[in-house]
Design a protein with these regions (language model features):
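Conserved nucleotide-binding/hydrolysis micro-motifs of P-loop NTPases
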Residues: 51-53, 105-106, 140-146, 203-204
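Conserved RecA-like P-loop NTPase ATPase core
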Residues: 22, 100, 136, 186
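NTP-dependent small-molecule kinase module
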Residues: 2-9, 34, 150-227
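Walker A (P-loop) phosphate-binding motif
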Residues: 8-35
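Hydrophobic "anchor" residues on beta-strands that sit immediately upstream
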Residues: 15-18, 98, 135
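A glycine- and Lys/Arg-enriched "phosphate-lid" helix/loop adjacent to the NTP-binding pocket
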Residues: 108-181
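Hydrophobic residues at beta-strand termini and immediately following loops
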Residues: 47, 138, 198
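ATP-dependent small-molecule kinase phosphotransfer cores
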Residues: 40-130
Length: 227
């Protein structure tokens, strides 16, 4: 299946999304891009994975009681994404603005499949998604990403560590297994969906320059078409 199966980008705005394993630095890069675009005078909107108020309370309660199965977890995230698509993503795109998304459908494709969901089924669930202008994949080697997360957090959460899958009782070991499976899914999606790979081991400034160059190419192309 290719990305042409998804909603074609028929809106005047631009949608740039970042993806990657935990600890890849994607959120840092998106925040820098957001600040820069605002400073350049662009109308910019931001949307973050799993942030819809529609499902926040349900998600919190279910996580606390460890009630999620891989399928229910997947469907709740899809509900969150559908709400944000209609509320936070499509309206700005219709108005010609720039939307930056911290994680997009590829997060579901990677995490849900890593948890054992059927690959084709997960892709079918998100067929309504708008095709992004560019999907950046910040790729960090597994050991680098793991070290960044483990060294910066006192304790890994149950679902974050993949402990619900019962691969092992050790949180750090489980997290490593989980993130390894996620990275495998991202790597296979590069060709499938045309993800733009950024080397997340480079200096932050160099990654940002590369990201801005790609974004500006699309914005300048839009300006030329308008002229």
């Amino acid at each position: 299946m290719t990305m042409t199966a998804y909603g074609q980008h028929r809106f005047p705005g631009k949608l740039f999304v970042v993806e990657g394993t935990d600890g890849s630095g994607k959120s840092t890069q998106l925040a820098l891009l957001y600040q820069w675009l605002k400073a350049e005078g662009h109308h910019v909107f931001f949307s973050e994975w799993n942030s819809s108020p529609l499902v926040k309370a349900t998600t919190r309660r279910a996580k606390k009681k460890h009630l999620f199965t891989p399928t229910t977890f997947s469907l709740l995230h899809a509900t969150d994404f559908a709400d944000r698509t209609e509320r936070d993503i499509i309206p700005p795109l219709k108005a010609g603005a720039i939307v930056l998304a911290d994680r997009y459908i590829y997060t579901a494709f990677a995490r849900d499949v890593a948890r054992g969901c059927d690959r084709a089924w997960v892709r079918e669930v998100y067929r309504f998604a708008v095709r992004p202008t560019v999907a950046f994949f910040f790729r960090a080697p597994l050991d680098v990403a793991i070290d960044r997360i483990v060294s910066g957090r006192p304790q890994l959460k149950h679902y974050e560590a993949g402990l619900d899958m019962q691969w092992t009782d050790d949180p750090e070991e489980s997290f490593t297994i989980f993130q390894g499976k996620i990275l495998e899914e991202y790597d296979r999606m590069v060709a499938e969906f045309g993800l733009t790979v950024i080397d997340a081991t480079r200096k932050i400034e160099r990654q940002q320059r590369e990201m801005r160059k790609i974004v500006m190419r699309h914005l300048e192309g839009e300006a030329e078409e308008a002229a």
